[in-house]
Amino acid sequence: MFHPRRTIKALLLPLAAGLALTSLPAQTAQAASTLTNGGFETDGAGTGTPSGWSEYGDTGASFSESGGHGGSYRLSHWASSAYKVETYQYLSGLTNGNYKLTAWVRSGGGQNAAYISLKNCGGTEQRTNLPVSASGWIRIVVPVNVTNNQCTISINSDANAGNWINVDDLTFTSGTSGTSIHGADISSLAKSEAKGGVYRNSSGTTGDPVAVLKSAGMNYARLKVWVNPADGYNTKTQVLATAKRIKAQGMKLLVDFHYSDFWTDPGQQAKPSAWSGHSYSQLKTDVYNHTYDVLNALKAQGTTADMVQVGNEINGGMLWNEGSTANWSQLAGLLNSGYDAVKAVNSSTQVALHLAKGGDLAGTRSWFDSAVAQGVKFDVIGLSYYGYWHGSLYDFQTTLDDAAARYGKPVYVAETAYPFRLGSEDSHEDVIDLSSELVSGYPATVAGQTRWMNDVASIVEAVPNGRGLGVFYWEATWTAVTGNGWDPTDASSGNAWENQALFGYDDRALASMSWFSHR
């Protein structure tokens, strides 16, 4: 990557403003061994306490109404003044073990808190926040390990006047969920440190940024590799050196091959200068040799790559013009050369194909349908998803789910990010620097950045059949350091990304790193 209704009804009961939601009674008259009325269809619209459910707090703010996800009705939370309400159901007589709650939700955003949790299950309460999605329904999951034969399903809102949520089609079944990749791209790190970049933990103590990220929960690092860039960075040499640091922290490694001397993305896929003028047949050999050389060197030093991207954001192909999607048979040959080189070094290394189409269902289908038809070999699907460019969270979930199901492959977010503030640290304009460019419901604050990452991770976690692997944050360490700009041919260029790093303008680790601890 680089740069470039809710219907209103009269309240049924007076609101008891300000009641806390933490003193839920230990049990209720609604105890059952299976979830009752998870689709809110039993009572119809206008019911203050749907069958099977109980309420606590400002109870008039919780009610059923028309406009369900799968049926005719849904549960809604809304009030014309600030409110706190919990809609819950107590389950007893459960067989101990792993369970998963699935729910379809919508939210207008703006609440102090809006989440679904599983609690009183014998262990730590598990929560999933409701992503902001004012129109499309989003599926979320909440996993729990029941150890005391009971569990409480809890739908919570701590909201300001006019805030709303919709919830529908809840199921509570055996199973579990979670993601295995809590990662970040740190390709900028080597040059940053060479140019004087400093990184601190949240207390302000200078330290190794790889260790700081690891301590926050990061478990996978992504490094890009260029062939012969003008500034000498992001080469095999830097990848080998940084890989040692990554593996020393017990993290896994993804190597992202651009097959270029410069950034590759949907708008540019230039061949390396050393490969200029090569025939298509020679380019296939170039791809194989370059891929094998870098990966074999990593293996030789004990830092074998765990995953490899053959190409970066290859919407239009790679190694233009020979590898353009205008000539799919040639693109397939190049991609398969990369795949074969990866497997020749280590058969266990997973090979990913990466598109910048995280919210583009039709585009993702078209591309991968062509890849499959041409016999392209791959193990994993990676998608870039930046909410300010690539569509809504609903679009994102629809695309991700479809890719996993249609091709039977695991999926992951290869790149995403979000600003923690507006306004550049240096004199260079940032990529996202206006409030009008933000995703609705997600402010440019540390809290907004944290919420964005957790909500993206929740959507990946909810991919059916456990095919959602996780998320990579893009360029967590790209702070504003003179000389470490986006253009390797221009030392005066800024990076335009420092307001989306995971280290602040004071070089301290941001609280938003907490997203690495997402399930």
Pin down the residues of each PLM region.
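Beta-strand acidic-aromatic groove motif in beta-rich domains, primarily in extracellular
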Residues: 48-52, 85-87, 109-120, 151-155
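Extracellular carbohydrate recognition and processing domains
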Residues: 121-150, 160
